[in-house]
């Protein structure tokens, strides 16, 4: 069984077992997360009073299960997942927020710095109901202040967002922006030292 990452101290044996079983779960690739999986991690999160996060690869496999504290998760070293110019990491992060808040500044910083496909916060109440899921993705060619775009909150019954198509479109835009930048860089340049007239 794969290991849990993060703040696992003090968990009961059955809580640890249920968290470890999350590695067996699959998400339809076009869904950001399945309703059942979102409901289950929300319930576990409220039971242990800690945020729970999942890093899900593009085929829908849970690659990392992360246990945080009441306010945040710490994403472990994911350098084994490739990242190349014009490409995203190949992982999306979905995690719970215990107080129902939207994505935090830390979440958005992780999204941008780690080049994640998508960052999501599952806003769940204590009964396990999921009123909304907040999502964001990197904004290719962003020239403004923020390098990401916040999407409208999703309802739990609308989780098929065409995830793979969205990611492919983002990577195409990133590659185009990179090739334009490369073309501009490759132009011949000259430095004028002096101009004199007779």
Describe the predicted segments one by one.
Residues 1-85, 153-183, 187-197:
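Glycine-rich short-loop/terminal segments
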Residues 7, 100-118, 144-156:
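A broadly tuned preference for mixed-charge, low-complexity surface segments
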Residues 49-53, 89-91, 116-118:
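Short, surface-exposed beta-edge/turn micro-motifs
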Residues 53-55, 62-65, 111, 119-121, ...:
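Generic structural hydrophobic/aromatic packing signal, biased to beta-strands
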Residues 56-60, 98, 121-128:
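Short, flexible beta-strand-to-coil junctions
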Residues 65-115, 124:
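Short HxH-centered metal-ligating active-site micro-motif
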Residues 73, 116-119, 132-136, 193, ...:
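Generic preference for hydrophobic/aromatic residues in regular secondary structure cores
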Residues 118-166:
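Long, charge-dense
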């Amino acid at each position: 069984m794969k290991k849990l990452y993060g703040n696992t101290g003090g968990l009961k044996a059955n809580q640890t077992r249920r968290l470890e079983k999350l590695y067996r779960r699959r998400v339809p690739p076009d869904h950001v997360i399945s309703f059942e999986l979102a409901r289950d991690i929300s319930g576990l999160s409220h039971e242990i009073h800690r945020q729970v996060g999942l890093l899900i690869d593009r085929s829908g496999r849970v690659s990392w299960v992360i246990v945080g504290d009441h306010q945040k998760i710490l994403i472990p070293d994911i350098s084994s997942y490739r990242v190349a110019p014009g490409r995203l990491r190949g992982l999306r992060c979905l995690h719970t927020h215990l107080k129902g808040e939207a994505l935090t500044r830390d979440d958005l910083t992780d999204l941008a710095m780690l080049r994640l496909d998508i960052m999501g916060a599952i806003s769940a109440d204590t009964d396990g109901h999921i009123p909304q899921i907040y999502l964001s993705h990197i904004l290719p060619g962003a020239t403004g202040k923020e390098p990401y775009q916040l999407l409208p909150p999703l309802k739990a019954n609308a989780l098929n967002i065409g995830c793979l198509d969205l990611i492919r479109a983002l990577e195409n835009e990133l590659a185009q922006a990179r090739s334009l930048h490369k073309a501009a860089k490759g132009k011949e340049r000259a430095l004028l030292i002096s101009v004199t007239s007779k």
